[in-house]
Amino acid sequence: MQITVMKGKIHRATVTDADLNYEGSLTVDMDLVDAAGMRVYEKVSVVNINNGARFETYIIEGKRGSGEICLNGAAARLGMKGDKIIVITYAQVEENELPIDYIPKVVHVDENNRKR
């Protein structure tokens, strides 16, 4: 039987911009994408800590080292610059193939979205 598990998480990232007129997605600094084991165009769940909004979108490439976290398109209505968010990816795995000691990649960031 397959189960869905958390694969990676960027925890308490600060939204640096929100662009309503951009084609939908979430722009993320590639340093954070790599650190969390995520991929460009991968589906993500986003949780806005400030307002409780939860939504799904996909990642697009942000400039390395920029700390960029930008809500694009309709997602820009669900958060604003300065909000804290959690970005989560999931994977489906065979339950009997998941190691007992499995640990997803979790990236904690500072107020400038730099990996701690």
UniProtKB/Swiss-Prot annotation:
MF terms in GO: aspartate 1-decarboxylase activity
GO BP terms: alanine biosynthetic process; pantothenate biosynthetic process
PTM comment, free text: Is synthesized initially as an inactive proenzyme, which is activated by self-cleavage at a specific serine bond to produce a beta-subunit with a hydroxyl group at its C-terminus and an alpha-subunit with a pyruvoyl group at its N-terminus.
Reaction(s) catalysed by this chain's protein: L-aspartate + H(+) = beta-alanine + CO2
CDD domains named in the record: Asp_decarbox
Binding site for substrate: T57, G73, A74, A75
EC number: 4.1.1.11
Record text on cofactor binding: Binds 1 pyruvoyl group covalently per subunit.
Pathway(s) annotated for this protein in UniProt: Cofactor biosynthesis; (R)-pantothenate biosynthesis; beta-alanine from L-aspartate: step 1/1
Top EC category: lyase
Top-level lineage group: Bacteria
Cofactor(s), by name: pyruvate
InterPro entries: Asp_de-COase-like_dom_sf (IPR009010), Asp_decarbox (IPR003190)
Modified residues (Pyruvic acid (Ser)): S25
Active site per database record: S25, Y58
The entry's keywords: Autocatalytic cleavage, Cytoplasm, Decarboxylase, Lyase, Pantothenate biosynthesis, Pyruvate, Schiff base, Zymogen
Subcellular location: Cytoplasm
GO CC aspect terms: cytosol
Known partners and oligomeric status: Heterooctamer of four alpha and four beta subunits.
NCBIfam families: panD
Described purpose of this protein according to its UniProt entry: Catalyzes the pyruvoyl-dependent decarboxylation of aspartate to produce beta-alanine.
Family the UniProt entry places it in: Belongs to the PanD family.
Protein name: Aspartate 1-decarboxylase
Species whose genome carries this gene: Leptospira borgpetersenii serovar Hardjo-bovis (strain JB197)
